[in-house]
């Protein structure tokens, strides 16, 4: 795997590639897990080359403490990429990515204001802006995103369509642990006792009950429920176990 620490170096290399070659792209913030690996493998099966990026994007954290405590595990992340078909990895720094000081932003004013957008003001502005910047840098044929962040996936699909971007957005199924808990970088921050509660959250959330009944059962376990909502035939949830925030969704 070839690693690029400098954006100009990457741009020169990208421009040297034949336009006949397909590039798959799976952007990440690091602290990788099996869900990320599934994106890399899906890309490597469908493209000549697979590109990823490691960048903890400060503009999508509405809580500064979340950004501060987000695990940085670069060496392990690069190893996982190497083992799962990534050919090129971009490791940009914040000054390069936000040379404009975040003066220019991508904003969606409808669906992005619901659920995650309502509870994390500014979050999706940061997500869409960094994804747009990375798309312009990588110029991928296809880009891969997990269904765990389903609202994010829909917004990225919408952005690509609205702005006439010639990129195919591929959705990949949520990867889950044996307990049914969705793989997430945040899971690593759970204490053993919190982890048991998180496993119960996954089980209860997937029960065939009303959202109100599910909320009541979760709250009885000491879980803070931010929302459980249904949208376009899916059920979405965001909860807090201690100070660890977890999200999930599934098709009804």
Curated annotation (Swiss-Prot):
GO biological process: pantothenate biosynthetic process
Positions that bind ATP: 29-36, 146-149, 175, 183-186
Family per similarity comment: Belongs to the pantothenate synthetase family.
Originating species: Legionella pneumophila (strain Lens)
Main location: cytoplasm
Other facts noted in the record for this chain: The reaction proceeds by a bi uni uni bi ping pong mechanism.
Keyword terms, alphabetized: ATP-binding, Cytoplasm, Ligase, Nucleotide-binding, Pantothenate biosynthesis
Reaction(s) the record says it catalyses: (R)-pantoate + beta-alanine + ATP = (R)-pantothenate + AMP + diphosphate + H(+)
InterPro entries: Pantoate_ligase (IPR003721), Pantoate_ligase_C (IPR042176), Rossmann-like_a/b/a_fold (IPR014729)
Top-level taxon in the UniProt lineage: Bacteria
GO molecular function, one term: ATP binding
Annotated catalytic residues: 36 (proton donor)
Amino-acid positions noted as binding (R)-pantoate in the UniProt annotation, renumbered to this chain: 60, 152
Record-linked NCBIfam families: panC
Subunit-structure text: Homodimer.
Compartments, record wording: Cytoplasm
Binding site for beta-alanine: 60
Role summary: Catalyzes the condensation of pantoate with beta-alanine in an ATP-dependent reaction via a pantoyl-adenylate intermediate.
Gene field: panC
Enzyme class: ligase
Pathway: Cofactor biosynthesis; (R)-pantothenate biosynthesis; (R)-pantothenate from (R)-pantoate and beta-alanine: step 1/1
UniProt-listed Enzyme Commission number(s): 6.3.2.1
Record-linked Pfam families: Pantoate_ligase (PF02569)
Protein name: Pantothenate synthetase
GO cellular component: cytosol
